[in-house]
A protein has these predicted regions:
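Basic nucleic-acid-binding alpha-helical/helix-turn surface characteristic of O6-alkylguanine DNA
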Residues: 1-122, 171-177
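Regulatory, non-catalytic segments
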Residues: 124-135
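Major-groove DNA-recognition helix of helix-turn-helix-type DNA-binding domains
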Residues: 140
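Short cysteine clusters
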Residues: 143
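…primarily DNA-binding HTH/wHTH and HhH modules…
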Residues: 149-177
Length: 177
């Protein structure tokens, strides 16, 4: 018996290449930044959600796509109104980190330590970095806006690593710390 799909996804073109977005009926569950090819991007989707189906986006997903496309074209979009579905696999601490990270406006940055303070765990800068390294919804949860205290980029787990992080910050006109 084949498992019923609980996620849908689609690819969409942006200024930096084809991104992918997955969703449930409750909200966006994942965003993937461009891989080398659309086939590689699809393969990443299926690694995370093996039973997902590619389909036309629901209205809230179309709204998310429009926001991501605009942001990646340099428009200062704050994507806090997009519903998210964390499912049951995202730990509570990570959710708190993601909630704080969503408040960082385009063109601005915070340090890992500043995010830790805002989640009420001032000594948890490394744990913040680990949570952001597992962020399943980049751009909507703008982990690229969180930097090391010394002004360095810190890490970035999306394709292209820190070069992609710097590209996203440049698109937004952000100044490094």
């Amino acid at each position: 018996m084949v498992a019923a799909p609980n996620h849908s996804f689609c690819l969409f073109p942006t200024a930096i290449g084809s991104c992918a977005i997955a969703w449930s009926d409750r909200g966006v569950t994942s965003v993937w930044l461009p891989e080398q090819t659309d086939s590689h991007t699809r393969a990443r989707v299926f690694r995370r959600f093996p039973h997902s189906i590619e389909s036309a986006p629901l209205p809230f997903v179309s709204h998310a796509i429009e926001g991501i496309v605009a942001l990646l074209e340099g428009e200062a979009r704050h994507l806090t109104d997009i519903p998210l579905d964390w499912g049951e696999s995202v730990p509570e601490f990570h959710r708190r980190v993601y909630d704080v990270t969503r408040t960082i406006k385009p063109g601005t940055t915070l340090s890992y330590g500043e995010v830790a303070k805002r989640v009420g765990e001032p000594d948890a800068a490394r744990a913040v970095g680990q949570a952001l390294g597992r962020n399943p919804i980049p751009i909507i949860v703008p982990c690229h806006r969180v930097l090391a205290a010394d002004g360095g980029t810190g890490g970035f787990s999306a394709p292209g690593g820190t070069a992609t992080k710097l590209q996203l910050l440049a698109i937004e006109g952000a100044r490094l710390l």
